[in-house]
């Protein structure tokens, strides 16, 4: 399973660790992913999404039905 938010599309990015001597070593910055179950009243079922904390805030703002419609419009299967 890839480390990608299903709502925002955020994925890992690459950067550098920097020591005190400013030596650079490669590292990955991972998104703050959580697996969360949402009750969808219109479909009378639970939907499990893998999303970031920001994605949860978007669902709080727009509602689960609107967000699911956007995800399905992109062609993702839920």
Curated annotation (Swiss-Prot):
Keywords: Ribonucleoprotein, Ribosomal protein. SUPFAM superfamilies: L28p-like (SSF143800). Signal peptide: none annotated. One of its GO terms (cellular component) is cytosolic large ribosomal subunit. GO terms for molecular function: structural constituent of ribosome. GO terms for biological process: translation. NCBIfam families: L28. Belongs to the bacterial ribosomal protein bL28 family. This is Large ribosomal subunit protein bL28. It comes from Glaesserella parasuis serovar 5 (strain SH0165). The gene is rpmB.
């Amino acid at each position: 399973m890839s480390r990608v938010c299903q709502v925002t599309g955020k994925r890992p990015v690459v950067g550098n660790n920097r020591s005190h001597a400013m030596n650079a070593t490669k590292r990955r910055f991972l998104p703050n992913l959580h697996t969360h179950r949402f009750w969808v009243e219109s479909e009378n079922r639970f939907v499990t999404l893998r999303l970031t904390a920001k994605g949860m805030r978007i669902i709080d703002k727009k509602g689960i039905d609107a967000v699911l419609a956007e995800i399905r419009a992109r062609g993702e299967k839920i």
